[in-house]
Amino acid sequence: MIAQVSTKAHRARFLNACRGKWVLGATLPLDLALFSKSQPWRFYAGPTLALELSGCTAWAAGHANPEELASFLAFCGCESIILDENECPPPAGWCKAETLTVFGLAPGKALPLPAADETLWAGLTLDREPSAMDVARALYPADTAKQEDFYSELCTKRTRGKALVWALWQGSETICTVGAYALANRQAYMACGQTAQPLRGKGIGGQFRG
């Protein structure tokens, strides 16, 4: 049975379901540790399942009975779930909306830098500790609610050394950002890489270097 994580046994099930997983093995345990008593997060565990709910979206590690999972998500008001379909059958009656791809890089390895406009790069300023709100506004310029949620989450992780974000400035404008938003369990989950529309395709994002 899927139940809210409220006991040591539930927590152990949750963490066991996440163990050894790419991305989910970092993000879900970290979120449980930091936000288990915060809204809008909710955390649930089954015998072989870890489930994180935030708003109308769920993240799942491990697997569960498809019928039980479908009923539970409907009860919780979820509209979408992110899962590894090689491990977790989709909830009964649900259809796949899109495929998300995860790329992994082994510890100690590095990717080659792509070609970039060096003249443009020379006019940019690298900020290794950008304001959380500046990053939030760059990522969600038209959604103040998402800005506030992102700001709160990033500040919580940063103060505990669990997130690292860089940004590029062109004058007074944040034109590119990328971050490791879950530093946990020997993983660094990188996400929210975004470049301002007029500068996309110029190799800027791949040039972050310290």
Residue ranges and their predicted role:
Residues A50-W121:
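Acyl-donor-binding surface of acyltransferase catalytic domains
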Residues M133-Y189, Q194:
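A mid-sequence, solvent-exposed acidic-amphipathic segment
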Residues M1-T27, A110-D149:
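Short amphipathic alpha-helix that is part of the acyltransferase structural core
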Residues L24-L32, I81-E85, A145-C155:
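A short, aromatic/hydrophobic, helix- or strand-capping loop or linear motif
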Residues E68, P198-L199, G203-G210:
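Conserved acetyl-CoA pyrophosphate-binding loop and the N-cap/start of the following alpha-helix
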Residues N16-C76, I175-A191, A196-Q197:
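Conserved donor-binding loop and adjoining core beta-sheet/short helix segment
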Residues I2-Q4, Q39-R42, A92-T99, A122-L126:
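Short secondary-structure junctions
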